[in-house]
Amino acid sequence: MRNQSKQEELVKAFKALLKEEKFSSQGEIVLALQEAGFENINQSKVSRMLTKFGAVRTRNAKMEMVYCLQAELGVPTASSPLKNLVLDVDHNDALVVIHTSPGAAQLIARMLDSLGKSEGILGTIAGDDTVFTTPAPGFSVKRLYHFILVHFNQEL
């Protein structure tokens, strides 16, 4: 089981690195993972992971060719659990930001709005794939963040 959790940690670190959109070669990814404590990582393993997770090379904001994970483009179905539409949850000092599958933000926002102030939600603003949520009076951003993580079964 220890190996399984080490593998999960590797996958989490790998995905986090690709979200940074600054690695232009597999060698750079290998070095970053080694610096993060994954000593046994090599280029062939990184290559397999890039393929497994559907990573592509694209231009970042600085117009550099970098590896990144493709946005989840799966179309939700009527039987898709809402938690599957939530890709990431983060927060700052003012609000909680929820990243969803494309087109799902308004559905997630409407569901959160229906929970109301008693659950800590003052209101939401939704775009296509992003929801901004602000806490109700008496609720901290951190408390709302944890509530949303639990509600959508996201990792703490």
From Swiss-Prot:
GO cellular component, one term: cytoplasm
GO BP annotation list: L-arginine biosynthetic process; protein complex oligomerization; regulation of arginine biosynthetic process
Subcellular location: Cytoplasm
InterPro entries from the UniProt entry: Arg_repress, Arg_repress_C, Arg_repress_C_sf, Arg_repress_DNA-bd, WH-like_DNA-bd_sf, WH_DNA-bd_sf
Tagged with keyword Magnesium: no
Pfam family of the protein (one): Arg_repressor
Keywords attached to this entry: Amino-acid biosynthesis, Arginine biosynthesis, Cytoplasm, DNA-binding, Repressor, Transcription, Transcription regulation
Gene3D superfamilies: 3.30.1360.40, Winged helix-like DNA-binding domain superfamily/Winged helix DNA-binding domain
UniProt xrefs under HAMAP family: Arg_repressor
Family membership: Belongs to the ArgR family.
Descriptive protein name: Arginine repressor
Organism encoding this protein: Sodalis glossinidius (strain morsitans)
Gene that this polypeptide is encoded by: argR
